A protein has these predicted regions:
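Cytoplasmic helix-loop-helix junction between adjacent transmembrane helices
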Residues: 112-152
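Short amphipathic helix-loop junctions that connect adjacent transmembrane helices
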Residues: 26-51, 248-264
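C-terminal membrane-cytosol helix-exit motif in multi-pass small-molecule transporters
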Residues: 186-205, 396-404
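C-terminal transmembrane helical hairpin of 12-TM major facilitator-type secondary transporters
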Residues: 294-338
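C-terminal ends and interior cores of transmembrane alpha-helices
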Residues: 90-105, 302-315
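Hydrophobic core of transmembrane alpha-helices in multi-pass small-molecule transporters
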Residues: 14, 95, 108-123, 319-333
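Juxtamembrane intracellular "pre-TM" segments in multi-pass secondary transporters
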Residues: 200-234
């Protein structure tokens, strides 16, 4: 029985974000916590080397995505969404299975291979978004893309919670650090089967266009070549870089500052996900009705930089849960208004090109902080990557406040 493609696509997005969420509670324990029973390095290994290796392992996925996602998008235009989506999901399933195997046999190279494979085939999200655009009428596009945000939220709430729960042997005796990844692999495999059997091709305008294998790098050069959008792109890059520092290393910070285990890290990130959804439901639209995007960004970027710093000052774990709603509010407002401002600044016929450029900027911005943060944590302290998140967000606010000038419609040269 065929189902409406939107619901299959939304399930795909939930699976994709759920897998990312599962990593949050587990990964810091594998390479960043010598006191964890899941620690994969020898007891005589330098703790700092684990931090650096942790950073490289986190960076592998977005670095591979930087090159592969534009290629998968082109393949979906050329051969259709269905085969590319199925291939991406199969790669995701195999990647999680290899990651679980790497934990079981204590093979760090296999963990890197697994994350690289998932990154190379990780075009699920971009192809899913294109599929929704294929089947959505213009007047329903905002509503259906809002469902994407809701699917993101579900994945980011359930993922960390499941990651902490399924890795806890006190819940079920045979649970371990590998269990969440076996579970994610099975879900992705089921989703692959669902796409193959129940998903109708949505791309009715398949075009045999030339392939550009280095589209990601070309997109970065293109961003610099559009003068009217440089400030927005630079702000987006810095914001995502700051968020990359935070999301990559906050679990490590929680372990060493407050002695959090997998379950407590999972509960914290699940709470952040709940706050993010509540922001989307109750705050974003109300603020958008009263203020323009530039007005919102001038206080939300400064707000998120300040709240990131506030995490460092928290005297007890309870304060983290108090700060999280404020952090999620400023973060959600910044994301929504940067996307809205970029969309309003270009003509409708080039929205696709601008979306591709933005995706490449985000992938590169997500790849750099783990590489840098591992060295920061190893040579200074585990708090330093969180401080770097705050400072990078502050620079994003400075750049936008000082350099941004409104444009009616950007001239694409």
């Amino acid at each position: 029985m065929k189902r409406h493609p939107i619901w299959i696509i939304l399930f795909t997005i939930v699976i994709d974000t759920l897998g990312i969420g599962i990593l949050g509670p587990i990964l810091p324990q594998l390479l960043g916590n010598p006191n964890s029973p899941h620690y994969l390095l020898g007891r005589d290994a330098a703790v700092g080397s684990g931090y650096i290796m942790f950073g490289f392992l986190v960076a592998v996925y977005p670095f591979m995505q930087f090159f592969s996602t534009p290629i998968l998008g082109q393949l979906s235009d050329r051969y259709g969404r269905k085969p590319v989506l199925a291939l991406s999901l199969a790669g995701t399933s195999l990647g999680y299975a290899l990651f679980a195997t790497g934990i079981v046999i204590r093979s760090i190279p296999l963990l890197f291979l697994a994350r690289a494979l998932d990154g190379i085939t990780g075009g699920n999200l971009s192809v899913a978004q294109a599929s929704i655009a294929d089947v959505t009428k213009p007047e329903e596009r905002t509503k259906n893309f809002g469902l994407i945000g809701a699917a993101f939220g579900v994945g980011f709430i359930v993922g960390p919670f499941l990651g902490g729960l399924l890795a806890d042997p006190s819940v079920v005796s045979w649970f371990s650090a590998s269990t969440p990844f076996w579970f994610a692999a099975m879900l992705a495999a089921a989703n692959t089967t669902q796409v193959l059997l129940q998903f109708d091709e949505t791309n009715t305008h398949i075009r045999h266009v030339p392939m550009h294998l280095l589209r990601g790098m070309a997109n970065i050069a293109r961003a610099y070549a559009i003068p009217d959008l440089r400030t927005i792109f630079l702000t987006t890059f810095l914001f995502n870089m700051g968020f990359g520092f935070f999301i990559s290393f906050f679990g490590l910070f929680l372990i060493h500052r407050f002695n959090f285990n997998e379950a407590r890290i999972g509960n914290f990130f699940a709470w952040v996900g709940v706050c993010a959804i509540l922001t989307q439901i109750f705050t974003t639209r109300r603020v958008a009705a009263r203020f323009s995007e530039p007005e919102v960004l001038r206080f939300s970027l400064l707000g998120v930089a300040s709240v990131m710093f506030a995490y460092l000052l928290a005297p007890a774990p309870l304060w983290l849960f108090v700060i999280a709603p404020v952090s999620s509010t400023f973060n959600g407002l910044s994301l929504a208004n940067m996307g809205g401002l970029l969309s309003r600044s270009v003509a409708p016929q080039v929205q696709g090109e601008i979306l591709g450029i933005g995706s490449s900027i985000q992938a590169l911005a997500n790849a750099l902080p783990p590489l840098m943060g591992g060295f920061f944590a190893a040579s200074l302290a585990t708090e330093v990557p969180v401080l770097a998140a705050s400072l990078t967000m502050f620079v994003a606010w400075l750049v936008f406040t000082i350099l941004y000038r409104p444009v009616r419609v950007a001239a694409l040269t």
